[in-house]
Amino acid sequence: MSGARTAHALVFLLGCSALALGVCSASLEHGEAEYYVAAVYEHRSVLSPNPLELSSRQQALELMKQNLDVYEQQVMAAAQKGAHIIVFPEDGIHGFNFTRTSIYPFLDLMPSPRLVSWNPCLEPFRFNDTEVLQRLSCMAIKGKMFLVANLGTKQPCLGSDPGCPQDGRYQFNTNVAFSDNGTLVGRYRKHNLYFEEAFDSPADVDLTTFDTPFAGKFGMFTCFDILFFDPAVRLLRDFEVKHIAYPTAWMNQLPLLAAIEIQKAFATAFGVTVLAANIHHPTLGMTGSGIHTPLKSFWYHNMDDPEGHLIIARVATNPQGLVGTENTTSEMDPSHRKFLKVLSGDPYCEKDAQEVRCDEAAKWNLNAPPTFHSEMMYDNFTLVPVWGKEGHLQVCSNSLCCHLLFERPALSKELYALGVFDGLHTVHGTYYVQACALVKCGGAGFETCGQEISEAEGLFDFHLWGNFSTLYVFPLFLTSGMTLDTPDQLGWESDHYFLRKRGLSSGLVTAALYGRLYERN
């Protein structure tokens, strides 16, 4: 592990900082901890029938009241279970598909909690156009819990402000946090907008935290933000946040960016707890919420049920996840020993009933599987098929080479492939990605590799690794029926990042290492 990489490992692989030189790997271990009760609600929002048409403030409040009434019901249901905090989704109160003009009646005036100490429920007349904030504040008091919600807000600006829009106001996609006594304790204005013409991105990134008596410091960001350095990574790096409140309105995109998949990957990679509340509109591909710790997830994904869903879970105040370790067991797992040998350049040897066949890692014989290209996540991946019951595969693109060392208890008729992408993603956002992905293909043809599927039967014991140019690598792990699994081990070995798993309980849909090179966006 290079000195530069070691110097930054504290940021991403919590616990690896103890290893100044040499091996930095991570195994998943539990530790004793205190707990709190968290709740997230996946909300089927009542939407405006005509979001492009201008309505009155009163009409807007009447629509939002329908959603807020559901919120209050869920707060009280969570209170009966002893919840300390509840998180609601992005766009859950006002909906979406507005223009900049048509959303205006839905916006509350938003003072900064850094400048103003305010309890909207107890001081309802202090500011005009704050009816939604008042209602949320009163819910927090009634439920005796911290509450995080998302709403649209407005802020007047002067013509002397060079960034002031022509209509004389800023409009923000805003998360708010209230304490259990109704005080406004946090405001976050979404930085990385996702085709949201109704809203502005703030000139300066909000790095928002709020303190709680039950779990210390929480951070907030929204939806698309999870893929970018600001605010998500900087918030963890600079403020030592261990818990994230994450409202989102996420449209699932398989095989690499389903909602619960990226939520869990973020929690595992950074060793934090993520309270993720998604909107529930299955016809739009929008579902997938969860309470994710580095080791365990309580999630909900349902494309059939039209109604919302409340998740409540008991989670550690100090999440335990990636713990830096050298091998301390008397006997190393045989598959991991084989991985280390292959990584060091030793020949990979495959045993059958008649002989032992060895191929040097750098030399591929004439029977090696063919390389092909297929579109995955709108990107041109280079792939090789995964054939046989065991093997070692390699596939490269630009500076990234991905490897798979695998064994299969039984063959299935399904086609799997190992894919690599190292380049700038340019569809539905622009950002640089390095990805190694083991995926089930949609059919028997190579051209189906990368298609969106959610059911699988194939079982693997495997190591997946690559020579990533970034520290920020997210382990994506999705199994049949939109279920989540956790790696047995993650970490760096000889400047390669790896994921190890044995004993899958259901068929593998996706196992991937999703690297982000933030500086090359």
From Swiss-Prot:
Entry's Gene Ontology cellular component terms: apical part of cell; extracellular region; nucleolus; perikaryon
EC number(s) given by UniProt: 3.5.1.12
Family statement: Belongs to the carbon-nitrogen hydrolase superfamily. BTD/VNN family.
GO biological process: biotin metabolic process
Gene, per the UniProt record: Btd
Domain of life: Eukaryota
Pfam families attached to this UniProt entry: CN_hydrolase, Vanin_C
Carbohydrate-modified residues: N128, N181, N380
Protein name: Biotinidase
Lineage, broadest ranks: Eukaryota, Metazoa, Chordata, Craniata, Vertebrata
Function: Catalytic release of biotin from biocytin, the product of biotin-dependent carboxylases degradation.
Disulfide bonds: none
CDD domains: biotinidase_like
Keyword set, alphabetical order: Glycoprotein, Hydrolase, Secreted, Signal
Signal peptide residue numbers: 1-25
Active site location: E90 (proton acceptor), K190 (proton donor), C223 (nucleophile)
Record GO terms (molecular function): biotinidase activity
